[in-house]
Amino acid sequence: LVRRGDHALIQGEIPLSFLNKIQQVKYRLNPFIVNTAMLLEERGVSVGKFLPIVHYDLPPKPVDIAENKESRKKYRREAAEVMNKRAAEFKRSCRTRMTMEAVARFKDREFYIPWSFDYRGRAYPIPAFLTPQDTDFGKSLLNFADAAVMTEDAEEWLAFQVATTYGLDKATMQERLDWTRTHVSLIARVARNPIDHIGDWEGADEPWLFLAACEEYDACCLRQTRNLTSLPVATDATCSGLQILAGLARDKSTARLVN
Protein backbone atom coordinates (compact mmCIF):
# COMPACT_ATOMS: atom_id res chain seq x y z
CA LEU A 1 0.00 0.00 0.00
CA VAL A 2 0.97 3.62 -0.40
CA ARG A 3 0.18 5.78 2.60
CA ARG A 4 0.33 9.53 2.24
CA GLY A 5 2.52 11.11 4.90
CA ASP A 6 4.16 7.84 5.91
CA HIS A 7 7.81 7.48 4.89
CA ALA A 8 7.87 3.77 5.72
CA LEU A 9 6.02 2.84 2.56
CA ILE A 10 5.08 -0.69 1.68
CA GLN A 11 4.86 -0.51 -2.07
CA GLY A 12 3.04 -2.98 -4.23
CA GLU A 13 2.91 -2.92 -8.00
CA ILE A 14 -0.87 -3.45 -8.25
CA PRO A 15 -1.89 -0.71 -5.76
CA LEU A 16 0.51 1.77 -7.36
CA SER A 17 -0.76 0.93 -10.82
CA PHE A 18 -4.36 1.31 -9.66
CA LEU A 19 -3.70 4.65 -8.00
CA ASN A 20 -1.92 6.01 -11.06
CA LYS A 21 -4.71 4.75 -13.32
CA ILE A 22 -7.51 6.61 -11.55
CA GLN A 23 -5.34 9.74 -11.34
CA GLN A 24 -5.08 9.74 -15.14
CA VAL A 25 -8.83 10.30 -15.52
CA LYS A 26 -9.44 13.82 -16.81
CA TYR A 27 -12.50 15.80 -15.71
CA ARG A 28 -14.31 18.98 -16.58
CA LEU A 29 -17.30 20.70 -15.02
CA ASN A 30 -20.83 20.06 -16.25
CA PRO A 31 -21.90 23.43 -17.74
CA PHE A 32 -25.60 22.65 -17.36
CA ILE A 33 -25.25 22.02 -13.63
CA VAL A 34 -22.94 25.01 -13.18
CA ASN A 35 -25.42 27.37 -14.85
CA THR A 36 -28.37 25.99 -12.89
CA ALA A 37 -26.46 26.29 -9.61
CA MET A 38 -25.44 29.87 -10.36
CA LEU A 39 -29.06 30.86 -11.03
CA LEU A 40 -30.28 29.24 -7.82
CA GLU A 41 -27.40 30.79 -5.87
CA GLU A 42 -28.43 34.25 -7.09
CA ARG A 43 -31.98 33.59 -5.90
CA GLY A 44 -30.94 32.01 -2.61
CA VAL A 45 -32.80 28.78 -3.38
CA SER A 46 -31.67 25.60 -1.60
CA VAL A 47 -31.94 22.12 -3.13
CA GLY A 48 -30.60 19.08 -1.31
CA LYS A 49 -27.00 19.65 -0.24
CA PHE A 50 -26.86 22.89 -2.24
CA LEU A 51 -27.30 25.55 0.44
CA PRO A 52 -26.51 29.05 -0.85
CA ILE A 53 -26.25 31.82 1.70
CA VAL A 54 -29.44 33.76 2.36
CA HIS A 55 -28.94 37.47 3.05
CA TYR A 56 -30.79 39.16 5.91
CA ASP A 57 -30.95 42.96 6.02
CA LEU A 58 -30.57 44.85 9.26
CA PRO A 59 -33.71 46.67 10.39
CA PRO A 60 -33.78 50.41 9.67
CA LYS A 61 -32.62 52.58 12.54
CA PRO A 62 -35.44 54.51 14.18
CA VAL A 63 -35.19 58.27 13.81
CA ASP A 64 -35.22 58.78 17.58
CA ILE A 65 -32.55 56.17 18.39
CA ALA A 66 -30.20 58.75 19.92
CA GLU A 67 -32.59 60.10 22.55
CA ASN A 68 -35.18 57.32 22.99
CA LYS A 69 -33.86 54.56 25.24
CA GLU A 70 -36.70 52.09 24.53
CA SER A 71 -36.40 52.64 20.80
CA ARG A 72 -32.65 52.05 21.03
CA LYS A 73 -33.12 48.81 23.03
CA LYS A 74 -35.71 47.51 20.58
CA TYR A 75 -33.45 48.23 17.60
CA ARG A 76 -30.45 46.54 19.20
CA ARG A 77 -32.53 43.46 20.01
CA GLU A 78 -33.85 43.21 16.44
CA ALA A 79 -30.39 43.85 14.97
CA ALA A 80 -28.89 41.14 17.20
CA GLU A 81 -31.47 38.65 15.92
CA VAL A 82 -30.51 39.47 12.34
CA MET A 83 -26.80 39.15 13.12
CA ASN A 84 -27.43 35.73 14.71
CA LYS A 85 -29.33 34.65 11.59
CA ARG A 86 -26.45 35.85 9.42
CA ALA A 87 -23.93 33.87 11.48
CA ALA A 88 -26.04 30.71 11.31
CA GLU A 89 -26.56 31.16 7.58
CA PHE A 90 -22.83 31.69 7.02
CA LYS A 91 -22.05 28.43 8.84
CA ARG A 92 -24.83 26.47 7.11
CA SER A 93 -23.77 27.55 3.63
CA CYS A 94 -20.03 27.01 4.15
CA ARG A 95 -19.60 23.90 1.99
CA THR A 96 -21.75 25.26 -0.84
CA ARG A 97 -19.84 28.54 -0.88
CA MET A 98 -16.49 26.77 -0.98
CA THR A 99 -17.72 24.45 -3.73
CA MET A 100 -18.88 27.43 -5.80
CA GLU A 101 -15.48 29.07 -5.30
CA ALA A 102 -13.89 25.91 -6.72
CA VAL A 103 -16.39 26.02 -9.59
CA ALA A 104 -15.35 29.59 -10.41
CA ARG A 105 -11.72 28.50 -10.49
CA PHE A 106 -12.18 25.40 -12.68
CA LYS A 107 -15.21 26.48 -14.71
CA ASP A 108 -13.42 26.54 -18.07
CA ARG A 109 -10.58 24.13 -17.32
CA GLU A 110 -9.88 20.42 -17.53
CA PHE A 111 -8.38 18.93 -14.39
CA TYR A 112 -7.24 15.74 -12.68
CA ILE A 113 -8.00 14.47 -9.19
CA PRO A 114 -5.16 13.19 -6.96
CA TRP A 115 -5.94 10.14 -4.83
CA SER A 116 -4.35 8.37 -1.88
CA PHE A 117 -4.84 5.19 0.14
CA ASP A 118 -5.91 5.24 3.76
CA TYR A 119 -4.50 2.79 6.32
CA ARG A 120 -6.97 0.10 5.17
CA GLY A 121 -6.03 0.38 1.52
CA ARG A 122 -9.16 2.23 0.48
CA ALA A 123 -8.71 4.93 -2.15
CA TYR A 124 -9.89 8.44 -1.35
CA PRO A 125 -9.58 11.71 -3.30
CA ILE A 126 -7.23 14.18 -1.66
CA PRO A 127 -9.22 17.37 -2.49
CA ALA A 128 -12.30 18.12 -0.40
CA PHE A 129 -14.37 19.41 -3.32
CA LEU A 130 -15.25 18.43 -6.90
CA THR A 131 -14.57 14.71 -6.51
CA PRO A 132 -16.53 11.49 -7.16
CA GLN A 133 -16.92 11.13 -3.38
CA ASP A 134 -18.33 14.61 -2.82
CA THR A 135 -21.92 15.44 -1.86
CA ASP A 136 -24.75 14.90 -4.32
CA PHE A 137 -24.27 18.47 -5.58
CA GLY A 138 -20.49 18.19 -5.75
CA LYS A 139 -20.63 14.93 -7.73
CA SER A 140 -23.18 16.35 -10.16
CA LEU A 141 -20.69 19.02 -11.21
CA LEU A 142 -18.30 16.44 -12.67
CA ASN A 143 -18.17 15.25 -16.26
CA PHE A 144 -15.46 13.20 -17.92
CA ALA A 145 -13.35 15.40 -20.19
CA ASP A 146 -13.08 12.57 -22.73
CA ALA A 147 -16.58 11.75 -23.96
CA ALA A 148 -17.69 8.37 -25.31
CA VAL A 149 -19.80 7.62 -28.37
CA MET A 150 -23.44 6.83 -27.64
CA THR A 151 -24.41 3.18 -28.07
CA GLU A 152 -27.38 1.04 -27.02
CA ASP A 153 -25.45 0.03 -23.91
CA ALA A 154 -24.70 3.67 -23.14
CA GLU A 155 -28.40 4.53 -23.45
CA GLU A 156 -29.26 1.80 -20.95
CA TRP A 157 -26.65 3.02 -18.49
CA LEU A 158 -27.95 6.59 -18.75
CA ALA A 159 -31.48 5.29 -18.11
CA PHE A 160 -30.08 3.35 -15.15
CA GLN A 161 -28.50 6.52 -13.74
CA VAL A 162 -31.73 8.50 -14.09
CA ALA A 163 -33.79 5.96 -12.15
CA THR A 164 -31.09 5.22 -9.56
CA THR A 165 -30.57 8.86 -8.62
CA TYR A 166 -34.31 9.45 -8.46
CA GLY A 167 -34.60 6.81 -5.75
CA LEU A 168 -34.76 3.35 -7.31
CA ASP A 169 -31.34 2.29 -6.04
CA LYS A 170 -32.74 -0.97 -4.63
CA ALA A 171 -34.71 -1.89 -7.77
CA THR A 172 -33.55 -4.40 -10.38
CA MET A 173 -31.81 -3.23 -13.52
CA GLN A 174 -34.93 -3.89 -15.62
CA GLU A 175 -37.18 -2.05 -13.17
CA ARG A 176 -34.92 0.99 -13.38
CA LEU A 177 -34.89 0.95 -17.18
CA ASP A 178 -38.67 0.59 -17.28
CA TRP A 179 -39.13 3.48 -14.84
CA THR A 180 -37.01 5.81 -16.95
CA ARG A 181 -38.79 4.90 -20.17
CA THR A 182 -42.21 5.52 -18.64
CA HIS A 183 -41.20 8.91 -17.22
CA VAL A 184 -39.73 10.57 -20.31
CA SER A 185 -42.09 13.56 -20.02
CA LEU A 186 -40.83 14.22 -16.49
CA ILE A 187 -37.22 13.84 -17.63
CA ALA A 188 -37.71 16.23 -20.56
CA ARG A 189 -39.42 18.80 -18.33
CA VAL A 190 -36.63 18.75 -15.79
CA ALA A 191 -33.85 18.80 -18.39
CA ARG A 192 -35.27 21.64 -20.47
CA ASN A 193 -36.41 23.98 -17.72
CA PRO A 194 -34.98 23.01 -14.33
CA ILE A 195 -35.72 26.34 -12.67
CA ASP A 196 -39.45 26.50 -13.45
CA HIS A 197 -39.85 22.77 -12.77
CA ILE A 198 -37.71 22.60 -9.66
CA GLY A 199 -40.51 20.81 -7.83
CA ASP A 200 -40.12 17.86 -10.21
CA TRP A 201 -36.53 17.12 -9.22
CA GLU A 202 -35.80 18.60 -5.79
CA GLY A 203 -37.55 15.66 -4.11
CA ALA A 204 -35.35 13.00 -5.74
CA ASP A 205 -33.05 10.99 -3.47
CA GLU A 206 -30.05 12.64 -5.14
CA PRO A 207 -31.60 15.70 -6.80
CA TRP A 208 -28.52 17.17 -8.43
CA LEU A 209 -27.29 13.87 -9.83
CA PHE A 210 -30.84 13.22 -11.04
CA LEU A 211 -30.88 16.62 -12.74
CA ALA A 212 -27.55 15.93 -14.47
CA ALA A 213 -28.77 12.49 -15.59
CA CYS A 214 -32.03 13.92 -16.95
CA GLU A 215 -30.17 16.50 -19.03
CA GLU A 216 -27.78 13.90 -20.45
CA TYR A 217 -30.57 11.41 -21.19
CA ASP A 218 -32.71 14.11 -22.80
CA ALA A 219 -29.89 15.36 -25.05
CA CYS A 220 -28.41 11.97 -25.96
CA CYS A 221 -31.49 9.73 -26.07
CA LEU A 222 -34.69 11.77 -26.39
CA ARG A 223 -33.76 14.74 -28.58
CA GLN A 224 -30.54 13.11 -29.83
CA THR A 225 -28.78 16.45 -30.14
CA ARG A 226 -25.55 14.90 -28.84
CA ASN A 227 -23.96 11.65 -29.95
CA LEU A 228 -21.29 11.75 -27.23
CA THR A 229 -21.80 11.22 -23.53
CA SER A 230 -19.50 12.28 -20.71
CA LEU A 231 -21.73 11.69 -17.68
CA PRO A 232 -20.23 9.50 -14.92
CA VAL A 233 -22.55 6.62 -14.03
CA ALA A 234 -22.08 5.32 -10.50
CA THR A 235 -22.71 1.82 -9.24
CA ASP A 236 -22.41 0.88 -5.61
CA ALA A 237 -22.39 -2.38 -3.72
CA THR A 238 -24.54 -3.33 -0.78
CA CYS A 239 -23.28 -5.93 1.70
CA SER A 240 -19.81 -4.97 0.49
CA GLY A 241 -18.09 -6.22 3.64
CA LEU A 242 -19.52 -9.71 3.18
CA GLN A 243 -18.70 -9.56 -0.53
CA ILE A 244 -15.05 -8.89 0.25
CA LEU A 245 -14.90 -11.64 2.87
CA ALA A 246 -16.60 -14.10 0.52
CA GLY A 247 -14.10 -13.24 -2.21
CA LEU A 248 -11.08 -13.56 0.07
CA ALA A 249 -12.32 -16.88 1.43
CA ARG A 250 -13.61 -18.03 -1.97
CA ASP A 251 -16.77 -19.01 -0.14
CA LYS A 252 -19.49 -19.70 -2.72
CA SER A 253 -22.24 -20.15 -0.15
CA THR A 254 -21.68 -16.66 1.29
CA ALA A 255 -21.21 -15.12 -2.15
CA ARG A 256 -24.66 -16.32 -3.22
CA LEU A 257 -26.25 -14.41 -0.33
CA VAL A 258 -24.96 -11.00 -1.44
CA ASN A 259 -25.54 -9.02 -4.62
Model-derived features with residue positions:
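Non-catalytic nucleic-acid-binding interfaces of large nucleic-acid enzymes and RNP effectors
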Residues: 1-259
